[in-house]
């Protein structure tokens, strides 16, 4: 058994496969995810686990180049959750964010119920 960091085996494997410029999503409980996109579903009940808990655990393990959130998140908690953790944050409409989902490596679904708690994360390199 691992003694620290991510414990979910599917999430560990997915994170280990990420390369420079590849993207993944940390999503709220309601984001419609295309059937062809791999989903790591961590949701237990509505509200658990929270977006920030999952986001922080993943960010401890990956190098991040930037992120994309929905315009609709601006001025609300999801924007601050992302901007507090990632320097380069772009915005697109929620519809455009959903249209980008088929191109991500995977989606991590949380139990978060705060609207627009979704972020596309772009991986960097540690050198």
UniProtKB/Swiss-Prot annotation:
It is an enzyme of class 5 (isomerase). It catalyses: beta-D-ribopyranose = beta-D-ribofuranose. Its EC number is 5.4.99.62. NCBIfam families: PRK11797.1. It comes from the Bacteria. Catalyzes the interconversion of beta-pyran and beta-furan forms of D-ribose. Substrate binds at residues 28, 94, 116-118. Belongs to the RbsD / FucU family. RbsD subfamily. Keywords: Carbohydrate metabolism, Cytoplasm, Isomerase. This is D-ribose pyranase. Pathway: Carbohydrate metabolism; D-ribose degradation; D-ribose 5-phosphate from beta-D-ribopyranose: step 1/2. One of its GO terms (cellular component) is cytosol. InterPro entries: D-ribose_pyranase, RbsD-like_sf, RbsD_FucU. It comes from Cutibacterium acnes (strain DSM 16379 / KPA171202). GO terms for molecular function: D-ribose pyranase activity; intramolecular lyase activity; monosaccharide binding.
